[in-house]
């Protein structure tokens, strides 16, 4: 085994490796609208403050791109204090509306990344400590994310991190399955791996694989998530703790 604590490292992308709130909020606001005649920089600057605040408020409960639509449809005075409350709101949205939104959002992200590449990349920020962590585990790191693979790859390339990544599993709705599949393919016992995510649901599900699971407290979190992490006996990982992994 290499001279580090784990044989493989599994990392979420948004909220663990990169802060992409600005881009995700804009994507949600503009998806389905004809904005191709405007620059991305101008679009980013005029996302309504009230919507940006609502998106950030709900972000801890949104696991995948299809969840983002909730932030655009619910009233601003609705309060969400648990994952179950969020899922109840989401269940009230027609499945076809969600499907259309995801298609529109992916198309818009692809347009931005191909027509205004530098601005699109610049709307993302790498969290402190990630560079060093990836360097220590170079070629033993898998990104398991709900984000699409191409966008994740582009951002990693931009920040010079792609050299450390063994693979990206994009649009992953079942992260436990992804972890098990990679471990099987690499002949690694899941118990010799570490999974880091800022979403409580993902952490709980992956803990069933036998992998060591750390909940990233610097990601999209709320007080309810801190309480849920304690109830689920999840190990909390602070940004400053990454140097000890």
What does each of the following model-derived ranges do?
Residues 50-121:
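A metal-dependent, Asp-based hydrolase signature
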Residues 1-63, 70:
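Active-site neighborhood of HAD-like aspartate-dependent phosphohydrolases
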Residues 6, 138, 165-166, 210:
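Short, well-ordered alpha-helix to beta-strand connector turns
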Residues 16, 23, 149, 201, ...:
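Conserved Rossmann-like nucleotide-cofactor binding loop
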Residues 142-194, 200-208:
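Substrate-recognition "cap/lid" segment bordering the active-site pocket of phosphatases
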């Amino acid at each position: 085994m290499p001279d580090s604590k784990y044989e493989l490292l599994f990392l979420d992308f948004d909220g663990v490796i990169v802060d992409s709130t600005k881009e995700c909020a804009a994507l949600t606001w503009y998806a389905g609208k004809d904005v191709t005649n405007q620059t991305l920089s101008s679009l980013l600057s005029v996302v309504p403050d009230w919507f940006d605040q609502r998106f950030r408020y709900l972000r801890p409960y949104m696991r995948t791109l299809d969840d983002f639509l909730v932030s655009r449809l619910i009233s601003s005075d609705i309060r969400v204090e648990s994952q179950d409350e969020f899922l109840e709101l989401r269940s009230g949205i027609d499945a076809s509306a969600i499907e259309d939104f995801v298609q529109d959002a992916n198309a818009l992200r692809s347009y931005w990344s191909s027509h205004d590449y530098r601005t699109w990349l610049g709307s993302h920020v790498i969290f402190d400590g990630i560079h060093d962590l990836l360097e220590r585990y170079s070629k033993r790191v898998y990104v398991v994310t709900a984000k699409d693979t191409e966008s994740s790859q582009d951002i990693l390339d931009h920040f010079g991190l792609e050299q450390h990544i063994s693979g990206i599993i994009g649009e992953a709705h079942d992260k436990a399955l992804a972890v098990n599949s990679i471990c099987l393919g690499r002949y690694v016992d899941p118990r010799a791996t570490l999974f880091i995510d800022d979403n409580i649901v993902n952490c709980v599900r992956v803990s069933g694989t036998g992998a060591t699971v750390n909940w990233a407290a610097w990601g999209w979190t709320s007080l309810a998530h801190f309480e849920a992490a304690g109830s689920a006996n999840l190990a909390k990982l602070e940004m400053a703790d990454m140097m000890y992994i």
